[in-house]
Design a protein with these regions (language model features):
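A residue-level detector for the "anchor" residue at the start of short, highly conserved motifs
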Residues: 3-202
């Protein structure tokens, strides 16, 4: 459940209730449940340590919203952009990462989320296990070294990957192995916040 605090009154919105809301409405409601918001400057990275011991490394232009403390049955945060999560284990309080087009549910694990573009998002699992739920109500369970592609609010693909290629941005590198020119320019555009167009001659 997502806890919303408005004028000192606690409201509980269940998953079923949220399922009937639009993507924009869900995002607006969830924004009210977080005390803190950070937006990483262009070209920089930021490390956040949450009160439960969870570590978040956020990439350039990423927005992260989180509470000062976790009071409910679940630990919930919101992310828009790209972030790596090292979640502190707590079997009684699952950790939920919300975005505009999917949700990741974990107990304790390490994974990378990339949703700069909500029409084409990725989740890469480094360690542990997670369950994804999309705005289309698709559910996908992941194992380590798997990547899930999400398109237009639904599940598109799951495959094995080298997770280092998707987390090396934390060391200031970008892996472009096997990517098309269009994919490369899109990633650089997201990172720097500018429009980069490929040369037709390439």
């Amino acid at each position: 459940a997502t806890l919303l605090f408005l004028i000192g009154i606690k409201y509980i919105i269940t998953e079923d209730a949220m399922g009937g809301l639009s993507r924009m409405e869900v995002t607006e409601l969830m924004a009210d449940s977080y005390d803190e918001e950070v937006e990483v400057p262009v070209g920089e990275k930021m490390t956040l340590m949450l009160v439960d011991g969870t570590k978040i490394v956020a990439n350039s232009r990423t927005i992260v919203r989180y509470p000062k403390r976790f009071d409910g049955d679940c630990r919930e945060v919101y992310v828009k952009g790209e972030a790596y999560f090292d979640v502190a284990h707590d079997a009684e309080h699952p950790f939920l990462v919300h975005s505009d087009n999917f949700r990741v549910k974990v107990l304790g694990t390490r994974f990378n989320v990339n949703n700069y573009d909500t029409s084409d998002s990725q989740v890469v699992l480094v360690q542990g296990s997670v369950e994804l739920k999309t705005t289309n109500n698709d559910r996908v369970r992941m194992k380590p070294n798997e990547m899930v592609n999400l398109q237009e609010g639904g599940f598109a693909e799951k495959r094995l990957v080298n997770t280092d290629e998707y987390t090396c941005w934390m060391q200031g590198m970008i892996s472009l192995t096997g990517e098309s020119v269009e994919s490369v320019t899109q990633r650089l555009s997201h990172y720097y916040g500018v429009t980069i167009l490929p040369d037709d001659k390439i």
